[in-house]
Amino acid sequence: GSWRAVVLNDGDVITFKGPKGKGCRGNLCFAGGVDIPPVMNSCSTYIRAKIGGVEGRALKVGDVIKIGEPTALWKKLGGFCLPEDLDPAQDANAPLAIITGLQEDAFTEEGKKLLFESEYTMTAESDRMGCRLEGAKIEHTEKGADIVSDAIPLGAVQIPGHGMPIIMLADRQTTGGYTKIGVLTPLSMEALVQKMPGSKVRFRRADVSEGVAEQMKIKEAVRRARELRLSHVSRTHIEASRSLSGHFTLTVEGKRYEITCEEI
């Protein structure tokens, strides 16, 4: 199941079924990471530039990927499972929240009204660079759609002259010269990238405080996950006794370690 650590042995085969639950994508993580040459401190693949990963391309049948050596902690996590209520993801059918930005005045009032009242469809042209939507045309003011190129953050809602929203994703360019009406909040971004071509999308307004609150919620979920991971290892593999002097005796796999702790 998801959110679970599984110990694999030589010859084991992992299989996946179709999309189920909250989205169409899942993540398979390897303790120790993948053992491939990093590019700019990353082992990810950027297919457009043909760099990173395995020869800068998508994986294909027959590829062999070496796995790095996991740390001692990860070796003890067989059977560990995170509770599903730890997932901060929002309702997959909820409207996506947009924090409007400085270029909002480049759009007419009618255009902005249409954006937040209309339903859009994700097109088949969507990729890791951007999610292209089709629906009601968003009208610009006399200023037009072109601007002096500026930075494009993750989740920016860019609207070129054709009036169709494009939400910028992980492989987006660093700068662009089209107007951006705003940016999605963190949890709305997570919901968006789980959608498939043909999925319906609606939007609502949000403010900066909501985006900050979502980011804090994600950070708290990560903190709790780490805490539960350590608790699992401590409960299943470690025995410890403590003296009143701040001195610890820690026993791990039969080996005894003397530890002194001082509060600072």
Predicted regions and their residues:
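Conserved "landmark" site that anchors the functional core of diverse proteins
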Residues: G1-I264
